């Protein structure tokens, strides 16, 4: 978990997420339906839908299930009245936390989100309280590659930045609207993309110690266990040394 790697800070949670496959599928389908409703069913012209499809495929959802969800969104089915809502708050250690929800009932959603903050020593803030600390970006992960060749391909494709990580992987940042075109350009250059998504990147991070790190992880788990929560973003940083103590 060294450095400010967004991916490194979530790797330790993959196993727990896999154990909740049914709930994950429900959330993925919601996102597919909503993305198709808002931006249409053409993956090439709808970055949000493409990201949703990629996530669904990486979670081993079948193409048939994905296509049915997209058709429901385009056709205006009963579950297309979902709205995206962002809640902002403060977590353990003074961390900034943003919670992206997809819901048809705001009262139900807030009744799930608020207690999670309270139980973990944090508190739900007002709109704009921490949002200014994050930027919406496209993020592409390449597992292993020649750095010079990848940098050239990424720049040619229109990427904003590329960062080498200690484990040999690379994180490529783009304007969120350009994620699809940059991804296509990098793939066309022959590189294998491990993951790609639109995400929220913090401008500053908060180093967590062995006392506060578990509390933040508990908060994230509680929030992601809420049915209406799609994504949780935070600026907590857990070092390798602290991670070894958890």
From Swiss-Prot:
GO MF annotation, one: DNA binding
One Pfam family it belongs to: TACO1_YebC_N
Keyword Transcription regulation in record: yes
UniProt-listed SUPFAM superfamilies: YebC-like (SSF75625)
Taxonomy, superkingdom: Bacteria
Keywords per UniProt: Cytoplasm, DNA-binding, Transcription, Transcription regulation
Keyword NADP: no
GO biological process: regulation of DNA-templated transcription
Localization per record: Cytoplasm
HAMAP family, alphabetized: Transcrip_reg_TACO1
UniProt-recorded name of the protein: Probable transcriptional regulatory protein HD_0596
Origin species: Haemophilus ducreyi (strain 35000HP / ATCC 700724)
